[in-house]
A protein has these predicted regions:
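Beta-strand-loop-alpha-helix segment that lines the small-molecule cofactor/substrate pocket
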Residues: 66-124
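Basic phosphate/pyrophosphate-binding loop/patch that engages nucleotide-derived ligands
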Residues: 108-116, 130-144, 236
């Protein structure tokens, strides 16, 4: 029986707590949050779980095997490091930290102590992304030439990380899951429209040795909500639209063929407009994965 302590019961904490409670081989022993009113709400739903307004109570409990860090991003590094140094496994909400050096340090500590350090990249456990991976690995869409991701909405503006750290981490985790290659070059640009110097609109471009290009568009300033990833293969293409209630993944038998014309010294394009296939996916909560 794995005994878990949870730090934070704000926006995501209730979801993490509920899913841990539903696991047969797991017991949530304690939840800590600095706001007593949030802990009172927890007690209304899970009266048997111990609560505390002091995070030290979670770290110092010898019966707790693992700690879930579900707190503001600026606190991830400190809490995760302390948990690892206390000999406890760690699940941390994305993004893992506010910078690369802190993330690398946490990884090194976990390896040294032979502990599990896991980031809550929830999308990797959705039926939609699992189906995309299955299609890509089958060779159905051919060689991937490009991925184009859009993750925009009005808010929520964060106070401790910019829009790339907040939103692009979802898409980057999906990209790394779909393809084994890692980028050769990374370029990012963004702009801040508030007074805190935190970018609210940003664009990220990843280029690979194979010629693959990935472009991600993230924004907290859009009047509409879009959550879409387009995977372009040289045979077929996939569109993942997370806003769709049921038909989230569509495979397009569309594309083009380049026909060289040496005599006219130009390139001719032959377009293919085939069918659209909607594969069956399992629409279950990702945290149950």
């Amino acid at each position: 029986m794995l005994k878990v302590g949870i730090l934070g019961y704000g926006y995501w904490g209730p979801n993490i707590t509920r899913n841990f409670v539903q696991l047969d081989d797991c017991r949530v022993k304690m939840v800590a949050d600095s706001r007593q009113e949030r802990l009172n709400q927890l007690k209304d739903v899970h009266p048997s779980i111990k609560t505390s307004t002091e995070v030290n109570d979670v770290f110092e409990d010898p019966e707790i095997d693992a700690i879930a860090v579900v707190t503001p991003v600026s606190t991830h590094y400190g809490f995760a490091k302390r948990a690892l140094l206390s000999g406890k496994h760690v699940l941390v909400e994305k993004p893992i930290t506010t910078n690369t050096s802190e993330a690398e340090e946490l990884i090194a500590i976990a390896r040294e102590k032979k502990l599990t350090l896991m980031v809550d990249h929830t999308f990797l456990y959705t039926g939609s992304v699992e189906k995309m991976k299955e299609i890509v690995d089958s060779g159905q869409i051919g060689n991937i030439k490009y991925l184009d991701g859009t993750r925009i909405n009005l808010g929520l503006f964060q106070q401790d990380v910019n829009v790339l750290w907040d939103l692009a981490s979802h898409d980057i985790s999906v990209v790394n899951y779909l393809i084994e290659e890692r980028p050769k070059t990374i370029q990012a640009t963004g702009i801040c429209h508030t007074d805190n110097d935190i970018e609210n609109i940003a664009y990220l471009t990843l280029k690979y040795v194979s010629g693959l290009i990935v472009h991600l568009n993230c924004s907290w300033s859009s009047p509409v909500k879009i959550r879409q990833i387009l995977v372009g293969g040289d045979k077929k293409m996939i569109v993942f639209n997370d806003i769709e209630p049921t038909e989230k993944v569509k495979v397009y038998d569309r594309g083009y063929t380049v026909i060289p014309d040496d005599e006219k010294k130009k390139v001719l394009i032959d377009y293919r407009l085939g069918d659209v296939t909607i594969p069956k996916i399992h629409l279950t909560e990702a945290l149950n994965g």
